[in-house]
Structure formats: C-alpha cells, structure tokens
Amino acid sequence: MRAARLFVVSVLAALSLAAQEPSLSGTWSQTKADDIAAAINATVKDMNFIKRPIARGRLTKLNPAYKKVMITVSDKEVVVKLDERTPIHMPPGGKTAPWTREDGEKFMVAAQVAKDQLVQTFKNEDGERTNVFKLSPDGRTLTLTATVKSPQLPRPLTYSITFGR
C-alpha cells in the first residue's frame, strides 16, 4: 500500500512539472540573427549624404547581435541582461523607471510581462526602442524583435534575434 501511494505521488509530481508553463526567466544563447547591418542600411538609405553615415554609425554601435540574454521575472522586478552589459532593473506592470545606459544617455524604461512575452520599452527625447521577447509555445526558443524609432530616422529600424536555452 505504501509503495502504491509513493508511486501515485511520484506520478502526480511528474505531471505537475510537465504541466508548468514555460518561463521567460533564464539564460538564453543566440541561435540565429537577422542581418542587422542590412536592416540599418535599409533604414538610413533615404537620408541625405551628410546624415546617413552618422545615423548608420550610431545605429550600428547601439544595435549589436546579442549573443546571450538573461531574464529574471518576479513580482518585484524584471531584470534583463544582454551579453556583458549592466543588467537593467525595471518595475513590473509597465511602470516606468529612470535608467542610464553605460554611455551616460538617460532613458525612461518599462517592462510589461504577459504569459509568453516581455515588452521592454526605452524612451528619451531622441526616440524610443521597443524590445519584444517572445517565447515559443514549447518554451525552447526566445525571439527578440527590436524596433527603434526616432524623428531623425525616415523609417523604424526593426530586426530579430533568436535564442535557445
């Protein structure tokens, strides 16, 4: 009888683990990335010859093909760390918080978490960037779609990077 109870408890525990929703939280490594240089060139192609190389250089510097992302989601905060950059701590629920990038540029940053998606938004007077981290249904793949908008750009810059566990 005791063995039967242990078996039932073991089966229920296994089913409970199998039924858990996949989580955004964890460490993810790049498996595929769009051609970001081509996306940048398409974004700046209609700019005049003076502004185009300046915009291309700045966009190239600020939009690398990240190799690793670490995400931590809790009731108290959302933390995103890209490659070796400083982690970004944000309040949950879409509330904005001040954040200063490593180069000193200041932003208001926000994080909105849904079951299978994290939307991270950076805004300042120069424009805004939105990172949408979308989890695949099986929880094995995370796709980052970045969109950069600015009044200085003729069109938004958009590209995607795919990560695996």
Report each predicted region and the residues it spans.
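Absolute protein N-terminus
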Residues: M1, A19-Q20
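Bacterial N-terminal signal peptides that target proteins for export
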Residues: M1-S10
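Hydrophobic h-region of N-terminal signal peptides that target proteins for export
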Residues: S10-A19
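PEST-like low-complexity, intrinsically disordered acidic/proline/serine-rich tracts
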Residues: Q20-R165
